[in-house]
Amino acid sequence: MTFPGDTAVLVLAAGPGTRMRSDTPKVLHTLAGRSMLSHVLHAIAKLAPQRLIVVLGHDHQRIAPLVGELADTLGRTIDVALQDRPLGTGHAVLCGLSALPDDYAGNVVVTSGDTPLLDADTLADLIATHRAVSAAVTVLTTTLDDPFGYGRILRTQDHEVMAIVEQTDATPSQREIREVNAGVYAFDIAALRSALSRLSSNNAQQELYLTDVIAILRSDGQTVHASHVDDSALVAGVNNRVQLAELASELNRRVVAAHQLAGVTVVDPATTWIDVDVTIGRDTVIHPGTQLLGRTQIGGRCVVGPDTTLTDVAVGDGASVVRTHGSSSSIGDGAAVGPFTYLRPGTALGADGKLGAFVEVKNSTIGTGTKVPHLTYVGDADIGEYSNIGASSVFVNYDGTSKRRTTVGSHVRTGSDTMFVAPVTIGDGAYTGAGTVVREDVPPGALAVSAGPQRNIENWVQRKRPGSPAAQASKRASEMACQQPTQPPDADQTP
């Protein structure tokens, strides 16, 4: 499914978006992991138009570099045209057409950069209908329960499109009309150029309205056609953050449903958020409160959640990830993570490995079958296969000026509360005793013990904390011990 070879597309993204009340340009606000402009350009790129032009104005210095990045991502050229003064949508189209050669003779699709649910099928249907009826212009329309803010479609008694009137210029009776302009058009370029040359700014906004082209072309006797979109969300625009949240929720509902239909169990769609670039394998179960963001990849037969957020994380088949926050990491096949686990960028857990409760890992590789069960920080480390890191262990990776790495071999067993003061290497098959502070390399098969014999300082509390609850408790315990009767010796032990 592609556009005909003579089709150019203009994306209007020059508006300041004042109703967003934001320092971020409106078209760069995000939903489902992409900016609004990115959603629109992805949909258009699927149809491979001959030319794709984005018209920028407000904050073009911030938006243009991102358009360039999107062009690289999409593998195609995207031109940028500049509207240097905010003189209306008609003027924006004139600016966009300046990027086309004067002898360009084809169809031009015009759309907005703030319609994030607009899809390739809707655009393809528009151009197909436009060509089928040989229209000078075909405009997408939809019907809204609350049409406030949209241009109204005016029709003749024969139901032909007569004009589009903007909200600010509409009469009270015209504002009752519920069929609205979706802001997406297909034009014959010659007819468009002719009509644009006759636009007037004699209106409430004192701007050149693209919508006035409809009435001009009709007065010329040209064919003006409308194509109605029943699913109004596909062409809904965003002017404020309420509308952004509403469309984000609707897009998420559609994304979740698509995964469900593909064989993924989503226990509670209302509390599950999945970005559009996320992939999930069959028979995976997603529990409530889960967010799968960015380019996260989940394998098949996994269990994810509840209360889990993964951003750009790759999860292998059959893995379990519970109450975990992770980013830019990988989890191997059959591995188990959570609950209350924090995976920071650069974490790579091997197949059948385990990262348990209250474990934080950063910039570390953990081998196949290795377990870090609980209460441990692993930073800047490489751990081999089938090792076990005891509870409350810490990889001490920062010396005050720089980060250092620790290497732990395979089949290593470390006692609870072991401190690895980097840089150190623990050889294959080595052990550490509980409470050991490892400051030097441990040879393969060795047992590292840093603590000396235990020494008890009698009556320390009584001397250092007299009268304290601890001192009183210890005094009572001592007195009770003194009152214990002495056991008489057994009869057969009497001399």
Swiss-Prot record:
The entry's keywords: Acetylation, Acyltransferase, Cell shape, Cell wall biogenesis/degradation, Cytoplasm, Isopeptide bond, Magnesium, Metal-binding, Multifunctional enzyme, Nucleotidyltransferase, Peptidoglycan synthesis, Repeat, Transferase, Ubl conjugation
Linker: annotated span: 242-262
Low complexity bias spans: 483-495
Pathway the protein contributes to: Nucleotide-sugar biosynthesis; UDP-N-acetyl-alpha-D-glucosamine biosynthesis; N-acetyl-alpha-D-glucosamine 1-phosphate from alpha-D-glucosamine 6-phosphate (route II): step 2/2; Nucleotide-sugar biosynthesis; UDP-N-acetyl-alpha-D-glucosamine biosynthesis; UDP-N-acetyl-alpha-D-glucosamine from N-acetyl-alpha-D-glucosamine 1-phosphate: step 1/1; Bacterial outer membrane biogenesis; LPS lipid A biosynthesis
PTM statement from Swiss-Prot or TrEMBL: Phosphorylated at the C-terminal domain by PknB. The phosphorylation is required for acetyltransferase activity, but does not affect uridyltransferase activity.
Positions of the UniProt region annotated as Disordered: 457-495
Catalytic activity: alpha-D-glucosamine 1-phosphate + acetyl-CoA = N-acetyl-alpha-D-glucosamine 1-phosphate + CoA + H(+); N-acetyl-alpha-D-glucosamine 1-phosphate + UTP + H(+) = UDP-N-acetyl-alpha-D-glucosamine + diphosphate
Chain positions covered by the region annotation N-acetyltransferase: 263-495
Biological processes, Gene Ontology terms: adhesion of symbiont to host cell; cell morphogenesis; cell wall organization; entry of bacterium into host cell; lipid A biosynthetic process; peptidoglycan biosynthetic process; regulation of cell shape; UDP-N-acetylglucosamine biosynthetic process
Endoplasmic reticulum found in the keyword field: no
Sites bearing N-acetylthreonine, chain numbering: T2
Catalytic site positions: H374
InterPro entries: Bifunctional_GlmU, GlmU-like, GlmU_C_LbH, Hexapep, MobA-like_NTP_Trfase, Nucleotide-diphossugar_trans, Trimer_LpxA-like_sf
Compartments where found: Cytoplasm
MF annotations from Gene Ontology: glucosamine-1-phosphate N-acetyltransferase activity; magnesium ion binding; UDP-N-acetylglucosamine diphosphorylase activity; uridylyltransferase activity
Cellular component GO terms held in the UniProt record: cytoplasm; membrane
Binding locations of Mg(2+): D114, N239
EC identifiers of the protein: 2.7.7.23, 2.3.1.157
Cofactor: Mg(2+); Co(2+)
Region annotation (Pyrophosphorylase) ranges: 2-241
Sites where the protein binds UDP-N-acetyl-alpha-D-glucosamine: 12-15, 26, 83, 88-89, 112-114, 151, 166, 181, 239, 344, 362, 377, 388
Cross-link Isoglutamyl lysine isopeptide (Lys-Gln) (interchain with Q-Cter in protein Pup), where in sequence: K362
Matches recorded under HAMAP family: GlmU
Assembly and binders: Homotrimer.
NCBIfam families according to UniProt: glmU, PRK14352.1
Protein name: Bifunctional protein GlmU
Species for this entry: Mycobacterium tuberculosis (strain ATCC 25618 / H37Rv)
Lineage: Bacteria, Bacillati, Actinomycetota, Actinomycetes, Mycobacteriales
Gene that encodes it: glmU
